[in-house]
Amino acid sequence: MDSAAITDHGVMYGVIDFYRAARAEGINPILGCEVYVAPGSRFDREAGSGEDRYYHLVLLAENNQGYANLMKIVSKGFTEGFYYKPRVDLAVLKEYHEGIIALSACLAGEVARYLQRGMYEDAKAAALRYQDIFGKGNFFLELQDHGIPAQRLVNQELLRMHEETGIDLVATNDVHYTRAEDADPHDILLCLQTNKKLADEDRMRYEGGQYYVKSPEEMAELFPYALEALENTCLLYTSPSPR
């Protein structure tokens, strides 16, 4: 692996340590954040509830300007948009979009949320809005597969959306721990974080044990129908990054 990205949820606390550790190992560090996007204004404390209180969006700094803008975006989330999570809105993304590459994110992304509800046209409209903000070639539809049926449904619709809109695809893994054998310790840490017990049925969990750093061979096995998406991911992570 010659490149790696950090995209913690809503924060950038770890980027400096990550950057230094990656450079020390000869790895190209991609600095990013998986931000929370409010469904309306970041100042609105009423819009949306539950899973619609915010959507996920992955942002990657392409260069030094992008890194500076990413810090602005994350700071705005805390100082102006905090409501359960540090949220930003489309106005913030428009103001600080330069030098940033965006990915549609996981099942909690706006595009994927609509697709899971059968609202294809709304999903496509959301994707086109993000492309308009970040520019053609700077917004990607993100394929993921952790053995979850909903992801396979979303992936098929993203392939269709790619054909209809020309928005390029990438294929990623939603990494929350390093190795496959770290799944159980990670589950325990989730319980500690959320004040739950392992036996609680309704607690937050990452099903299937697939949220680790996968090899190129494992990713190719998951996405034989989307080799171009895998190639785009490789190209994405060999692009210039902040120094």
Cite the ranges covered by each PLM segment.
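Positively charged, low-complexity/disordered segments
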Residues: 241-243
